[in-house]
Amino acid sequence: GRYDINVSGDAGSGISNYMVVYRPGTLTIDPAALTVTANDQTGIYGQTPALGTTGFTANGLLNGDTISGVNLTTTATGTSGVGTYGITASGAVGYGLGNYDITYQPGTLTIDPATLTVTAGSGTSVYGESVSTPGYKVSGLVNGDTVTTVSVDNTASSTSAGGDYAVNGSGA
């Protein structure tokens, strides 16, 4: 802001021989620099990123001024693939922020893989007969994704002795 600087109170030898004219000066106070940086965050594939308004750091606040929230946005959605996406910070709100020239710095959103569970089925066979290979069950798929191929095998054969044998799935 701009403020007047006033002068007054003339004193000195012979000052009475002058008509003193006072003219104010101007004091300009420039905004202080303030940097607001979006914090890096993580999300999970299939979930809409929940960035909130408090995932930021501020550098340069003075005199008890505060930031209570910042708009944080990203182009990532619940259907965005695993990878990294920018987080944009803007629109800081708080106390005393009119005294600052605010610069915003981006952060990074990392979308991590969702958990996909492939469970091999169970079954029974009789000693001496051909061994069936049970199917499988898939859980954890999101966004209409599908599993089209899973290899299921077991370690038993028609000549295996009675007992429990592992059934393994792979290739999803």
Locations of regions flagged by a protein language model:
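Solvent-exposed beta-strand/loop surfaces, strongest in extracytoplasmic domains of secreted
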Residues: 1-172
